[in-house]
């Protein structure tokens, strides 16, 4: 698995269709900036609104662009175990290096249900699996004990993207797995702290617009250059937070539009950012030198 930054890449749209040209330019910028993984069709990529054909084309295109320079990780999680398996097998066939599988949402499984879900998938998939824990969006939290049990019982469950706002959860996973399990921060504003505590990196939203800066933040922290990393963290902390003043990926798409990289389009039920959000983004981006 990668260490450093994996970008949870947006999916650009133009007139309702995937804008593959803008997508390719965005991915190439990420690779040139030192990003070590591209996460396709995740939350930030509006994966739940993509067709299977769009997913497969995006994965194949990303694989072609990365050319071994970065891993291609595909978001395949749903709240239906069989549907998740179908999307995961499709992603494997299309060239995925690993699978990011969010905990089932809405139906709120128990810890035993979460264990059974991931174990079922691990027994039928060949690529490494990254558990994705984001209770604020799913309504369920996978416990450190369940994560450790899966890490012990399923050889291809190798990592977790931990987006629980309680950093003690990541600490407990690290302790229970003896530091042998890859932990990635799922929150940009917690990346510095979590890497200091043993995480291998961050799966980042902010790196869509500040890839070089997020790469430097992660690398300096991994190299134990805490002073430099802390300075980067605080310089961009306000921007990291502003990217979540509305539901992700609404603000980051508005920010990319301000940079002239993509159109400010989303698929329903998401809609473009409010004007007040755009103005706030513009103000903060100018403040930190991202926008002139």
From Swiss-Prot:
Pathway: Amino-acid biosynthesis; L-lysine biosynthesis via DAP pathway; (S)-tetrahydrodipicolinate from L-aspartate: step 3/4. Keywords: Amino-acid biosynthesis, Cytoplasm, Diaminopimelate biosynthesis, Lyase, Lysine biosynthesis, Schiff base. Pyruvate binds at residues 44, 203. The keyword Transmembrane helix does not apply. It catalyses: L-aspartate 4-semialdehyde + pyruvate = (2S,4S)-4-hydroxy-2,3,4,5-tetrahydrodipicolinate + H2O + H(+). GO terms for molecular function: 4-hydroxy-tetrahydrodipicolinate synthase activity. Coiled coil: none annotated. The keyword Lyase applies. The active site is at 132 (proton donor/acceptor), 161 (schiff-base intermediate with substrate). Its EC number is 4.3.3.7. GO terms for cellular component: cytosol. InterPro entries: Aldolase_TIM, DapA, DapA-like, Schiff_base-form_aldolases_AS, Schiff_base-form_aldolases_CS. It is found in: Cytoplasm. Its main location: cytoplasm. GO terms for biological process: diaminopimelate biosynthetic process; lysine biosynthetic process via diaminopimelate. Gene3D superfamilies: Aldolase class I. The record marks 43, 106 as: Part of a proton relay during catalysis. Homotetramer; dimer of dimers. Belongs to the DapA family. NCBIfam families: dapA (TIGR00674). Catalyzes the condensation of (S)-aspartate-beta-semialdehyde [(S)-ASA] and pyruvate to 4-hydroxy-tetrahydrodipicolinate (HTPA). This is 4-hydroxy-tetrahydrodipicolinate synthase. It comes from Fervidobacterium nodosum (strain ATCC 35602 / DSM 5306 / Rt17-B1). The lineage of its organism: Bacteria, Thermotogati, Thermotogota, Thermotogae, Thermotogales.
